[in-house]
Amino acid sequence: MKKLLLIAVLIAACLSATAYVACVAAPLLGKNIKGSGKIVTKTVPAPDFDGIEASRAVKVVISDKVSDIRIEADDNLIDLVVVRAVKGKLEATLDQEVNNIQNGNVTITVPANGKIRSLDASSASKIIGETTLKAGKFSIEASSAAKIKAAVEAVSCTIETSSASKVEASIEAESCSLDA
């Protein structure tokens, strides 16, 4: 009887460990994808937004030469690019199921709509402004090896950098605070 109980406990422990790996650890492993090298383009309508949040190694270009969003990426990555407006911020990233991309190219060109007042880049992403961005109050945040390059005219601005990130900016403002 004791042997049966011990076997039942061991089976339950193995099932619990398997369930843990399937539910918790497996999503952390994600997909590993290598860019194909064949760049394709997709155009989507631009939603209303006043800020840009880039993450997961995507490059965002702010241009006054486009009115829609243009996504350029390797043909095997283009369907994994996520561009959406959430609470007024334009999120540009990759699908969460992708864990690692090798030799991948993802460039998202967004319109300089005259409303942009914040730039936030993280996780090796880049934001490049091709035109001067104007706002009353402007915020720039870069973290985790991200890069932001922009020209800003504002009454006030804040710039925050951390974790090997870089901000290269031309700022014209009455006041500007920097936290690096």
Q: What are the language-model segments listed below?
A:
Residues M1-A180:
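Intrinsically disordered, low-complexity terminal regions
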